[in-house]
Swiss-Prot record:
The keyword rRNA-binding applies. This is Small ribosomal subunit protein uS19. Protein S19 forms a complex with S13 that binds strongly to the 16S ribosomal RNA. Pfam families: Ribosomal_S19. Belongs to the universal ribosomal protein uS19 family. Gene3D superfamilies: 30s Ribosomal Protein S19, Chain A. The lineage of its organism: Bacteria, Bacillati, Cyanobacteriota, Cyanophyceae, Oscillatoriophycideae. GO terms for biological process: ribosomal small subunit assembly; translation. One of its GO terms (molecular function) is structural constituent of ribosome. GO terms for cellular component: cytoplasm; small ribosomal subunit. The gene is rpsS. It comes from Trichodesmium erythraeum (strain IMS101). It comes from the Bacteria. SUPFAM superfamilies: Ribosomal protein S19 (SSF54570).
Amino acid sequence: MSRSLKKGPFIADHLLKKIEALNAKNEKQVIKTWSRSSTIIPDMVGHTIAVHNGRQHVPVFISDQMVGHKLGEFAPTRTYRGHGSDKKSKR
């Protein structure tokens, strides 16, 4: 279920302040964040945000197509190592 339109998108306050400060200075800098649930807004386009995946910060470059999605969608938390191999075929 989507969020109510009257509430607006969720974005962490500390992240919004950092984005606005960088936009005011016209700088590009990597921003570290643990806020995977923050929605990507148009002000973030062109910035690189390092999103925490539980182990490390994954750098995510924000493009136009990402607006409206959550930051956590672009930093996978699980590593897939493949299914177990068939031991009979190795003999």
